[in-house]
Structure formats: structure tokens, C-alpha cells
Design a protein with these regions (language model features):
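An amphipathic alpha-helical interaction segment
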Residues: 1-4, 45
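Basic, amphipathic alpha-helical hairpins
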Residues: 3-10, 22-34, 54-58, 75-84, ...
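Short, Lys/Arg-enriched anionic-surface-contact patches
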Residues: 8-19, 60-66
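The cytosolic transmitter module of two-component sensor histidine kinases
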Residues: 14-18, 36, 85
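Short, hydrophobic secondary-structure boundary micro-motifs
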Residues: 34-35, 116
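Basic/polar phosphate-binding segments, predominantly the helix-turn-helix DNA-binding elements
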Residues: 37-66, 91-111
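Terminal helix-turn-helix DNA-binding modules in bacterial transcription factors
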Residues: 56-95, 117-125
């Protein structure tokens, strides 16, 4: 019974750790310096422990979670604003325009410029 309580507490702590990391991503995904190391320092845990727990709780590595969040925001900005692609890249944590285009295309299947054109066509603009 005691062992079960200890395991439950650990599970709860793991959930809290992952949620806190997700909050940090939400608040600072636009910071190009945001990394596993940064988050681990703030949450006072080792990177190996954190990486294991984060993947267990979210199904994603921290880096993939961060990239997904950045791409989600980039797509929203491409849809809803007229900002140039390189400006959007900077806003979501990629100050180097070519690298932003590379990551966007790798994750979304098309370049940011092409994505915007496809969305405009789809929305009849």
C-alpha cells in the first residue's frame, strides 16, 4: 500500500514536471535559446531524467514538442498576418531565415511562402 502511494506521488510529480515544461515552452517558444538544458536548469532536474519523463508524459521528445509548438504558431502567423516569412521565423525562435524555412518545410511539407499561398487559395483570398 505504501509502495502504491509512493508510485502515485511519483506519477503526479512527473505530470507536474511535464506541465511546467509545457508552460515554459508556451511562454518562451520564441526564444531561440530555449533548450532542454534551459528548462532543466529552471526546473532543477537532470536532463536525462527530464527527457525520460517528458517523453513518457507527452509522447514526444522535448525538442519535437518545441518544434511542433513553433510550427503551430508559424502557421497561425502565416495565415493571419502579412508578416514576411523571415519576421515570422524570428518571432517563433528561428532568427536565421534559411534555417526557419528548412525546419518549416521539413515539418509541414512545404516552404513558409508556399504554405501561405496554399492557405490563401484554400480560403479564397
Amino acid at each position: 500500500k505504501v509502495r502504491g502511494l509512493i508510485q502515485k506521488k511519483q506519477v503526479d510529480n512527473n505530470v507536474i514536471l511535464a506541465e511546467n515544461a509545457k508552460k515554459i515552452v508556451e511562454e518562451r517558444f520564441g526564444d531561440p535559446a530555449l533548450s532542454v538544458e534551459t528548462v532543466c536548469r529552471e526546473l532543477h532536474v537532470s536532463s536525462s531524467f527530464f527527457s525520460k519523463v517528458f517523453k513518457q508524459e507527452t509522447g514526444l521528445t522535448f525538442l519535437n514538442y518545441l518544434i511542433n509548438r513553433r510550427m503551430e504558431e508559424a502557421k497561425k502567423l502565416l495565415d493571419k498576418t502579412d508578416y514576411k516569412s523571415h519576421v515570422i521565423g524570428e518571432m517563433v525562435g528561428y532568427p536565421e531565415p534559411n534555417y526557419f524555412s528548412y525546419v518549416f518545410k521539413k515539418n509541414c511539407g512545404v516552404s513558409p511562402v508556399k504554405y501561405r499561398k496554399l492557405e490563401e487559395t484554400k480560403n479564397g483570398q
